[in-house]
Structure formats: structure tokens, C-alpha cells
């Protein structure tokens, strides 16, 4: 044999699993595009002055099995103490049927945000169920389909309160002193850029303060007290103050809905509906408001509409509120939310139903009552008489109690003066309560659970009678039908079948990087060593997490060319906000706080201007030239005009037009010349890794979409992670945290997310990807992503003009197909092509971004030549169909394109079209058929007849 043992061990085996085209297929595609090799192609496309001489040294590739073993050893350094810390995070029991059929199912986790509703009806239905849960529990009229976390939701509530307040001269926001500290932290961060004054005081003192536009109360305080705020809310409403209430999903099963008490906005975390703590996330936040305020709400809202056949169909409603349309005037910069986690919570409610949820909530409360009764019998004092699941226990020798807790591998909340906090949850057992008695009282306490249970069962006054819920919840049939595992499994499968995800076809969305989310990368997220840690546990119990995070941070530093990385932002938009705050605070530290102008190219993603506005900056748009590049003359003029007020520029590279701009370093130099900073949006990092880097180019800060470039799945619209990389001068200004000191970060800035490391439990996905690819594999992934895009552009350019190209007519990792000439000639639009692609078994490319009337295609490196050819052939077949319309063979008002997509119901109904059923549903080359369950959505009907809760079951049948 001629192969060495090292070659036979094949440590780079995963590279060939991740990258779609093999070496022979790559050569075929290189021949098509007219390049000798990958290196030659990159040399033609990427400006030479920004090409790295060698790839960043992040180590050699490891096999899937070796990487898993290495990460398992790291995870083993975490200590899984039983957590009673609470503070918005509790242990859960995720039903195995949901774990296996959703969280571990690529049919759910590889889907994209449901901008194309015809291929998204399953997860849209699950999200509508989530909204119904929120409406029932909060007592309000309108709910969103999730926000990033509870603290972010609080900040959004404050911003919304200001938007809807009639007290236009008021500029103060009141926060009750017993909200969770991380919530207050994030609220203060947001308030600072908005110029709001935050007042923190006891809730009963709110009326003593003047010029208050909004109030934030917490129904169950951070130390456990259940508040009846009905009278206070009534008084605040009489003064036209907007009232927001933070609430707990599980507590709301038993407690009066804040909406019934008059609250305008109610929000909180849905984490305890089946989502593991995961050292802080990801978790979905819920958010609800009165109907009159619906157009001021942040985040995605799912609405009921109709399709072209008049059948009920679901869609994202009121999108004109959002960043991708309204840009800096949007209600929020939110793009990624937490769809996968919201759907877990939604299905948790479906599986347990109202009876099951009440049983769980009552069991938690009963055990808390038993714990309270036993402690009080033995002379310990509780701070609060009214509680749901949390006790604040005064202890004489706190150090001794905490020492016994550590020996018992128990975490209590320890930051309360002369007291400890104890939060119970659905995993708590009677044995756990006995162990808590021993920790707080000593082993000879002599207490008996059954005896205490009899006492409290007949005399529990721990929840005020006025605060006990007296209305039914979750009465819709969907919450009262699927309680056996068989029924639940089939329901989830029926939803999954309605959607198109990466397990069925490529999703060629430009600017979205829908690459492989490998099974080996996903496995660690459900390991209990990662899933079960509380984000505020002692640092010595999370040594495995810290090692993994530090190693990942070090790799990202090398890959980006920056000096430090902050892992806190839990979405790309959140990363933008955090990066801009770092720039803002850097300027302030130099007495340049007046620098508030942010230059943004006209082609920018909508989150850029929305994030700049959130960071307290003024947006000034920079023109692009006829080739789609930043107009340097206009940039220089705008920078000069801004002068000493220039804060920064936000630029994407390669550009959103799909080209490597030759002048990117000159762009950086111009901005630096006028005292500004360069924010390089990391959305297109998949075309940089191993080839160039933001730091090498000359940028100062970037966010990284780990859910794009580094393989965290999109989850149907979240979770995501958006850590920021910064140069050393910005490192002191990245987000900090009020509860946990972030190791290695000297920052004193406020937090942007509830948890110190954001959605920490999905970071192992990116760790695994980098570890298995190694330096050379990562570079090759970028090269093949660029090759695949150029192959598509080369094959399609005669049928659909490629709008922008760089040197030698090349594109970067994505290309924009210009549909406008075809529309002018034939009347067929980019929308018609997008919907017709569904009949061919594909998700549409990105429509009308960054240029109206176009389709932006990004194939990623994970798609094989066979799949690329299938897409190309579909696009060419569609072009032939357009030509038949142009030739008059099919009328413009009745052809397979304008009627697309076609459903099975339509196929078996009376056929009145001038083309055959076969042409409609089995067009040329379609073998792996995907069947949409609805026809094209009627967007106008949906927004004019807004309905955002569950419809009768008959509508689904």
C-alpha cells in the first residue's frame, strides 16, 4: 500500500462531508466558469491587497468522533449541581417526544424564517399556537411570535411605551426595585441611548415620581413575592402612564392575568415550558399588548389570512413595522427571534394541555408550600407571605447554610442580604425538599413531607385570593387533543410535512448562508453537561463552558483578525447594536460624545439603520455607483460634511450586491481619516473565512452570524448568535453583565442580553464546526461557496442577467439575478418566479433585496453539483415557461407562473387552466416532489383583516 497511516486515519474526513462537490465536481465547475483551480478563481475575484498569505491557524481538522470525544471531555468539567437559583431560569422536563421529533429533527431546525409562507405553514401554525398560549395566559389581545429573551423584551417594552405614550414631554421610565437584576441591566443599557431617565424604586412609590411615561412591574418579584398590582395599575392608567408587567408562564397558569388587571404590555420568558437552561439560552421571550397598540409592537407576528383559493392560510403579518422594510424607522432592529424555542414551548403547552399545566403548576406550588411550612415550623422567617415557587428565607448563619448546600451539590440564590433564595420547578421532588430541609436546618430536622402536605393542603394562603386565576385557559381544541405520545408524534409530523427545510432541498437565500448543520455539530447541545447549567451558577461549576467559550473566542479572534471577542449578543442584530454601542462609548471616553452620525450604504441590510437608530445615532445614506459599489466621492463628501460628528460607517463585505469591492481599504481609510470607526457587518463572512478578514481589511468591529457562517441552524427563524469581534481599543467597551463578571473582559458597560454569554448552549455547534474543519477546511469552504455561486451565475447569466459583478465578470458567494427586464417584457415578476420554484421543489431565493425586482441567490459550499444543477435546470425551465407567456402561448392572467404554487387539492379539483396538471405540479425534471399545502397568500387580506390567534380546527382540515 502506498498510503501512510496518517492518510488512512483521514483526520479531515468531515471536510468532505461538509463540502458538497467532490474534487471531480469542483473541477467540472471550474471548467464551466473558466478557472484552472480554486486558488486561481479566488485570485481573480478577491482584491490582492486583502488576501491573506496563509489561513488563520486554528488547528488541523479532527474527525467527527475525535471532536465529539474532545468536547465531551471539556463538557465533563462542568458540575451539574441542582439549581434553586431562579431569577428567571429553572430546570425543566422537556418531553422526549418533543426532544426527538423537534429539537433533534432537521425538518424543524434547518428551516428558515417564514418569509415564504407557502412553504412554512407547519411552523407558522406552531407559532400561532405560541401566540394563543401567550394571549390566554397574559389576558391581552395581541401577541408576537417571540423575542430574544426576557430582558430584551423589557427593553422593547420600554421603547414601545415611549412610542405609544400620550405624555410626549415625559422622559422617565420607572422600574420596580424587585425586577430581575439582568432585566434592569438591559433596560438601563437601552435607556441610555434613547436618552431616557430610569428610576428604580419600590413599586408603591411610583406615584411619587413625576414625568413618567412608562412603568415596569414584575408580577412575581425576583425574590419571590406575588404582587397584586390591580389598584396601582388602575391609578397609573388614570394618569395615562403605560404599564408593562414582567410575568412567568408557569405562574400565570395559576395567577390572574395582568391584562385583566389593566396592564398595557405583558412579557416574560417561555423557558420553563420545556426549554433547558443551557447556561443562559437560547430561550424564547413572549410579548403581548392591547389591540390598540398592535402596530407599535416589536418582533414577528403571525396572522391568519387566505390563499388564492380562499382557504385559510398563515403568514407573518404587519411586516411594514419591521426593519427589512422600515429600516431606521422600524419598531425594532429584530431580525432573528427564537422560533425553534417558541415552538418547543408551544408544543409543550399542546402536549400537556390546560389540565396537565395546572397539575405541574400546582405541584410546584404545593412543594413550595411544604418547604415554607417546614421552615417556618422550625423558626425560620420568610421575607414574603405571598409566593408561587420562590421563597426568600432569612438565615442567621448564611455561610454555614451555603457551605452545607455546596456539600450537597445544591445552588441557592446567595446575593440577598441575610437571606437565601430558593426557587422550585417541575423537576423538584419530595426528596429534593427533604434535602433542602437538611441544608437549611441540619440533618436532624425531623420533618415529614406527608404530614406537612396535609397541613398546607387545607390551609394554603400563599397566593392572595385576588390573584388566583378564575378564567379558563387553553380552551382551543389544539391544546386538548394531542396528549398521547402517538397523537403528539403524528401532529408534529403533520406540521413538519407542510414545510420545506434543508433536509429536503437547498435553500438558496442570498445573505442567509443556509449551509449544512451537521448532525455531529448538533449532538452536544442536548448533553446534560451543557443543557442543565444555570447561567448564574458559580464560575467553578462552569469550567467546561468557559474552556469551550474561550477556545471558540480564540479561534474567532484568529479568523476575524480582531483582538477580542464578546459572546453576549444573541442575534446578529443584537451584535450590531452591541458593536455600535462599543463605538459610541469609545467616542465618549475620548470626549467625542458628539460623534453620532453613522454612514450606511444604500444597499445595506435593514437591520443596519435600525440598529444605528437604537444606538442613538443619526443615519446618513451613502450612494452606490452604477456597478453597485460604494461611491467613494459621495462617501468622502458625506464624511467631510459630518466632520467631527462622524461616528462610524456600517459596511458589509463582500457587499450585499454580491461583489468584493476593490476599494474596501480606501473606504476604511476615508472614515478613519475623519475620526470615525469602521463597523464591518459579518453577514457575508462565509466569503471571507480563511481568505481575508475584517481586521486585516481595516475594520474596527464586526458581528459574526454564528447561525450563518459557523453552522448554528436557523431554526425556522432563530435561535442565532451574534458575537462581536473588536480591535483592542474597543475591547473595554463591549457589553458587560451586572450579575456575572465575564472572564477576561475588563468592560464596565451594561448588558445587551439577559445572560452573560447569550445563548451559550448552542456555541458547541460552532466549536464543533471549526474543530472538524480546521484551518484548511474552513478556507476551502469559503472557496467552494464562491465557486458554487459563480457556477450558478455562469449557467444562468444568459437567461437572467447578473446585475452586479466584480473583476472579470465574477461574483462573490452570491449573485443577484435581475428580473426587471423580463417583467417589463412579459409581466412575469420575481414573485411569480419565486412561487413557481416551489412547484419545482425549491425555496425561493431572496426577493427584492438589496434591489427591488431581483432575486439574490446564495448556494453555500454544502450543496453538491447535482443539487446546483437541479436548481439551475429549474430556473432555465421557468425561463422557458416565461418565453411561452411572452410568445402568447399562455395568457398572462392564466399560466403556471402566476398561478403558482399548485397544491394537491387543486390537482384533484376541476381543472380550468390552459396548461396541463402535469405541467403544473410535475414540471420538467422534478423527481423529489414537495407539496405546498396552500396556494399563494393574500397579503392584503391578511393585514386588512388582522387575526393572530388560533382558528377553528375545521380550518386545518
Curated annotation (Swiss-Prot):
Catalytic reaction annotation: N(6)-[(R)-lipoyl]-L-lysyl-[glycine-cleavage complex H protein] + glycine + H(+) = N(6)-[(R)-S(8)-aminomethyldihydrolipoyl]-L-lysyl-[glycine-cleavage complex H protein] + CO2
SUPFAM superfamilies to which the protein is assigned, alphabetical: PLP-dependent transferases (SSF53383)
One GO term (biological process): glycine decarboxylation via glycine cleavage system
MF-aspect GO terms: glycine binding; glycine dehydrogenase (decarboxylating) activity; pyridoxal phosphate binding
EC number: 1.4.4.2
GO CC terms: cytosol; glycine cleavage complex
Enzyme class: oxidoreductase
Cofactor: pyridoxal 5'-phosphate
Modified residues (N6-(pyridoxal phosphate)lysine): 708
Keyword tags: Oxidoreductase, Pyridoxal phosphate
Coiled coil: none
Gene3D superfamilies linked: Aspartate Aminotransferase, domain 1 (3.90.1150.10), Type I PLP-dependent aspartate aminotransferase-like (Major domain) (3.40.640.10)
Function: The glycine cleavage system catalyzes the degradation of glycine. The P protein binds the alpha-amino group of glycine through its pyridoxal phosphate cofactor; CO(2) is released and the remaining methylamine moiety is then transferred to the lipoamide cofactor of the H protein.
Subunit comment: The glycine cleavage system is composed of four proteins: P, T, L and H.
Family: Belongs to the GcvP family.
Protein's UniProt name: Glycine dehydrogenase (decarboxylating)
Organism: Citrobacter koseri (strain ATCC BAA-895 / CDC 4225-83 / SGSC4696)
